[in-house]
């Protein structure tokens, strides 16, 4: 059996089933540990996955808005539609005529999507008429399934029951597809819709709808969950710029009536680390920036004797700088993509004076303590580029906001602050670590928002000249 035709307590193997035995143990447990994806999948399913709970503690809570956006999203792909048709024929003997009509309308629908999209992800801004035509054929299958009693399964009651469960599962998938197609035919301003394709041929193409503001769903299906009396949200990067450092996070997940607190770090940042902000760097949008950044990175690595993460906001910038200096460095050097992520981390830990060039996946979730990592170099303030349809739509909504909110102040800036704090946080992992963070973006000092971001970073000494930093004979960086 699979989840579609599981008979649950009517199955003769129910008492021996690993899944239900795990569920029974979870029901008895005082503490249940799950990841963010499972927590939000339970919320999206209206509590059908996890046992009831009265206290929720969420670590690394800054991820919740993005996880929630994914959890409450809807998706329809050409491969998914084909799989549904195959399932309907094999599992419940759906009429060939209806399936043929779905396949025909589906082909026309996805062909239109492929011709309408010019990028890997293309936002949909206008109604798509073909969506209504595909929806009409899906309704035919749904009505047929809802009318079936499966009385032809006369030999085995269990087979009839499994067929009913399969039909119910297919109807559930159809309902999700029909909701998405309705958003395509009749756009809803509260939803963001885009087309994704794997290549120009459209061998895999999908349309996705995501909530513009997931806080409504989080509030209704998680924060106000029956039985939940209180919740705790923790992260080293929740606080951002502004009078209320937690305002951005509270807005994105729908929190109110909170008791909030910033707990001091156990690390002595003033003595363990410094932030190097080089002078006279070009603006990041100037063509001179990357060559100057490459020169500055070489100088910094000479001081740190390698032992560095060099973090970029884009793969293109990483590759460009690596091509400029990677072969000339006096230290073992690799970049993201040279091998799988975990292998790169293992290589870094095992290699003396290693230098690792990386992008988004190395900004967080990597912990290198001790002498192996003495320096973290960041190319620029990590403002999100507006090629993400959800981010673009949220910026557009704030530009039209009548409450005086700003897309930059209320979205772009706090998001970048959180991201920068994550990158900076790679350096000091224990009370004995020391080292240097270098941020090559001149806006950290030339712009008011850059100085505001700087105030949100750990209280490290600010250094403007590399000769203010000296390297002890053994180990890590110290400040004169």
Predicted feature residues:
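ASCE RecA-like P-loop NTPase motor cores
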Residues: 1-480
